[in-house]
Amino acid sequence: MKIGFAFCGSFCNHPELLKIYEQIAQEHEVVPILSENAAKYDTRFGRADAFVERVESLASRRAVRDIVEAEPLGPQGAMEVLVIAPCTGNTLAKLAGGITDGPVTMAAKGHLRNAKPVVLAIATNDGLSASAPNIAALLNRKNYYFVPFGQDNAEAKPTSLIADFTQIIPTVELALEGRQLQPLLL
């Protein structure tokens, strides 16, 4: 199976997601896609060049890094499913609003034109505040599927939501059948 895997800039989640990504890459052909932020920013969680190198090495191919590279993915039918993980509040807003201004949102737009599933693994500090309407909008749209999610450290960050990244593969399997993995809320 050919799986698109798009990383956005929730940098603290990259190490955990790389483990899931590695599992997927061992069993499937992966099309790596990086948001511009994920590809270029060095943070306290790691250097961008090391992250990009690891993503590309595991997939044995260059990552899609801009709109021009992402645009042909849809018309070519390049993927059976697209996973966006971590899907940030910013990306949720763009998807909900139909804004296509980067490689991840362009890949999603092109993929959806083929009526194929997009799996979102959210990681956002404002999931129960500013991002809540965007989550609701996408839950109500065809071909979007969510990795089950819940509050992330409810005492310290009461509006923060995070997907259970270990559920990405089961979510993908059901999304390919047109079904949402349940329970959705953890």
Language-model segments: which ranges?
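A cross-family phosphate/adenosyl-ligand binding-site feature
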Residues: 1-118, 125-186
